[in-house]
Structure formats: structure tokens, C-alpha cells
């Protein structure tokens, strides 16, 4: 029995296409703005990024806290969120006790979805964790991609998310996707020509959206209210293999090779994943420093 998602989500297959769904977590005390104003400043600083100033597509989203540094404290930023053109992102809020139960329930629901399509295999749900987002009315999250699969849930305010095909090289070139997967080059090129590939989703409190692994997207918050949303991100055995294959491709390109793109043949991606993990194991055995 699902605790967080409406039962209709059980008929959908993750990472094949985006889909909207309804969630049952509205009113959860952890997501109340007053609770967030207490919890977030108490978290270790490395778990929280916040910035000021409207961002746009083409900005380096992963480094927005450096490029758009706020002069306000974190507490002041949260208190003035309605008027300050600010953005707060919290990594792994489940380390705080007020988020631990909702994290367990969301993880359990996602695992049920995976079992529905993949059967009762071990390690279906790989490295799940929460991300929390608070944004001023009208704020914009630049075009970016995730190294994970995502279930994004809206709790306050409304927004539009524009989502792009996972493997379309005219949106993100193979080389750029591989570098991003390897944490080597997180500023993605952007041009208006890419817009024609986008699929638009409007959603409000109580609604959610599945963002497939590595699918590019950007977000425009509406002007009606402060936006509060939370996602559970994770990998599956398939997406983990694809991630490792992307990282291997990036390494091979650095050696002057032209590897076949990821996402076209599952068997080839699995082989690349095996080779990448074997390489890491050898480097660890030889006590060589980790690299991308």
C-alpha cells in the first residue's frame, strides 16, 4: 500500500517517459514554512545552497550559490522569501529528524513502483535521498540535468517545468552530457532553438512530476506565492549503469577516442558500467587517487 503517492502511479514505468501524479503529503508538518525556517539554518552548511537574484537558462545551476551570492543570512533569506528574489536548495534534509519519516515513506513507495516493473530483485532503489527547494515568486531555475531519477512533489505555490528528451543530442550534446555525469563541466550551453524539444508541465500543491534519469529541464515559478517543493532522487540498476557508462565515455573522450553514445543499447551500457567499476576497483586496490 502506497503512503505518499496516489495508487494510479503504480501503472507507470519509471525512466521511460515523464508523467504527472498526485501525492498525499499536503499538510505534512515537516514542509511547513515555519518548521523549515527552524530546521534549515540548523543543518550543516554544506547541505544548504542559497542565492539571490533571478537566474536564467545558461547559468551554472550547480554553482549558483557562488555566482549569485546573497548578502543576507540564510535565516533572513527564508524570512523574506516572498520579496527577495531568492532560492534555497537543501540536500538530504532527511538527516534532520523531522524529515526522517517522510523519507522512509517516500523510499518505500518508490521501491514499490520499481518492484512492480522490475520484480523482486535486490538493490532496486540505489542511494535515495531528498532535495528540498524554496523559491521566491517568479523565480527561475536554469536548464540543468540530474544524475538521478526524480519524483518531484509540490507543496506550496505553483510552477511550470519544461522537460526535454533524455538522450536528444540537439538538446544536450553527448560530450556535454558525459562531462556533466562526470562532474566535469556543469554549465550547460543553452539556446532558444532547444525550446522546440520541450514538454511543458504545470503543477500545483498536491501534484508531482516524474523526471526521468538525465532528462534536461528548467523551472519557472508562478507569481502567486512562495514555492516549496521536495524531490526524492535515486538510481535504479539501469540508470546506475547508464551513469557509469557516461563517466567511462567522458574518460575515453579525454584519451582522444569517440565512444558510442549511452542510452541506445542496454547491453553495451552494462558492459561499459562493468569496465568503469573494474577500473575504480583497480585504482582503489593500488591506492591511486580517485578520478572522474
Whereabouts are the PLM-identified features?
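A short hydrophobic beta-strand segment most commonly corresponding to one strand
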Residues: 174, 224-240
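A short beta-loop-beta micro-motif enriched in histidine and acidic residues
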Residues: 127, 140, 144-150, 196-197
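Transition-metal
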Residues: 1-108, 247-255, 277-292
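Conserved short histidine dyad/triad with adjacent acidic residue
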Residues: 131-145, 164-168
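Ligand-binding loop in jelly-roll beta-barrel domains
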Residues: 204, 215-230
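A gly/proline- and charged-residue-enriched helix-loop-helix capping module
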Residues: 96-132
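Double-stranded beta-helix
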Residues: 154-210, 215
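Conserved double-stranded beta-helix
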Residues: 200-202, 236-292
